[in-house]
Amino acid sequence: MQLLLLTVGLALICGLQAQEGNHEEPQGGLEELSGRWHSVALASNKSDLIKPWGHFRVFIHSMSAKDGNLHGDILIPQDGQCEKVSLTAFKTATSNKFDLEYWGHNDLYLAEVDPKSYLILYMINQYNDDTSLVAHLMVRDLSRQQDFLPAFESVCEDIGLHKDQIVVLSDDDRCQGSRD
């Protein structure tokens, strides 16, 4: 049991150390992230968070940037339905790092950004003295989602998540289907 706890602890520490990497802001600024997005894949070191109706099985609807902060409308599974919620991730002194209050405190990082095509972000979530790692792949055009899955897998590996911890979202997902 002690060996298992040590292994889990080391895996989490390695994942958290990856946050110190270089994350460059989009060349044209955060404003380029504004507009419609489609959630296509999630990953987490805690599968319950991204399973259907999990706390981080959320679907980005749209984003906008103002004063260096990111504002997002997301669809959240809630009581058997999907609720549209607006959240704001506040800029920090660190480039491409934001503070987000959602199911605890989150350090949100923009890992890879091509504002016209795809966005990969990850969050380090603190909730009730428990730390979790969650990654999210979004695309502008759903027909190109397969083009960006290898980049998502690579980012996940870099932050300590494994391929078997990735969930590719289907078109049948209820929140994805309830988009405007």
UniProtKB/Swiss-Prot annotation:
Q: Where, by tissue, is this protein expressed?
A: Tongue epithelial tissue and parotid gland.
**Would you indicate the residue range of the signal peptide?**
1-18
Q: Which residues are glycosylated?
A: 45
UniProt keyword Coiled coil present = no
Q: Which taxonomic lineage is given here? A: Eukaryota, Metazoa, Chordata, Craniata, Vertebrata
PANTHER family membership: LIPOCALIN, MAJOR URINARY PROTEIN 1-RELATED
- UniProt cross-references to Pfam families, sorted A to Z: Lipocalin (PF00061)
Q: Which family does it belong to?
A: Belongs to the calycin superfamily. Lipocalin family.
Q: Which organism is it from?
A: Canis lupus familiaris
Asked whether the UniProt record includes Chloroplast among its keywords, one would answer no
Gene Ontology terms for molecular function? odorant binding; small molecule binding
Q: What is this protein called?
A: Minor allergen Can f 2
Cellular compartments annotated = Secreted
Q: List the disulfide bonds.
A: 82-175
Keywords per UniProt = Allergen, Disulfide bond, Glycoprotein, Secreted, Signal, Transport
The parts of the chain that form a coiled coil are none
GO cellular component, as recorded: extracellular space
Principal subcellular localization: secreted
